């Protein structure tokens, strides 16, 4: 019996190796949560007025603030919870009606920082940076409220930190059982 394949970045296992590890013959289909995240990413990308160089579904709870000057559009999964149907007389839930998935859809941009001479950013430059972030907010907010079934929609900004700033919408969508 050979050891399991290493799953590091430089030598990820092939799809057939994943299938062998899971006991499946064919590669699995993407989960409904991931498929929803991809659809949100595609819709968000088409809604943005200011282009980004990187668009991705982020793994984990945080988004890496690397190379922010390229501009990033991301979707991350915040949480997924089952919503149950009626409760039976014995106290058991009869069925799961749907899953409530909470996502974050946001952008990561660079902002002006202190220059090599120790001078802070000019007010004009800071205002221009804010204008781009606010346009991202408006574009993505319009997409979420007009083209999705998003609820509990809220925007917040993070940063600036290390020359980067981010703004993201958090919201919930109903999805079929994963």
Task: Please report, for each region that a protein language model flagged, where it lies by residue.
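Acidic-leaning, charged glycine-interspersed low-complexity segments
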Residues: 45-54, 65, 124-177
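Short, solvent-exposed beta-strand/turn "edge" segments of beta-rich domains on protein surfaces
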Residues: 88-98, 159-164
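Oligomerization/assembly interface segments of phage tail-like spikes and tubes
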Residues: 96-114, 165-177
């Amino acid at each position: 019996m050979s050891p399991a394949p290493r799953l590091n970045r430089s030598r990820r296992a092939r799809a057939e190796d994943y299938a062998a590890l899971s006991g499946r013959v064919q590669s699995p289909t993407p989960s409904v949560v991931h498929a929803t995240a991809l659809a949100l990413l595609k819709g968000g990308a088409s809604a943005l007025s200011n282009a980004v160089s990187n668009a991705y579904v982020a793994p984990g709870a945080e988004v890496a603030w690397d190379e922010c000057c390229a501009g990033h559009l991301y979707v991350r999964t915040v949480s997924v919870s089952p919503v149950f149907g009626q409760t039976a007389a014995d106290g058991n839930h009869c069925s799961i009606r749907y899953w409530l998935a909470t996502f974050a859809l946001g952008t990561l941009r660079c902002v002006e920082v202190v220059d090599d001479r120790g001078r802070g950013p000019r007010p004009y430059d800071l205002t221009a940076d804010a204008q781009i972030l606010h346009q991202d907010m408006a574009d993505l907010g319009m997409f979420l409220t007009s083209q999705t079934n998003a609820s509990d929609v809220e925007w917040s900004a993070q940063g600036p930190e290390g020359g980067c700033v981010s703004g993201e919408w958090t919201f919930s969508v109903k999805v079929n059982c994963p």
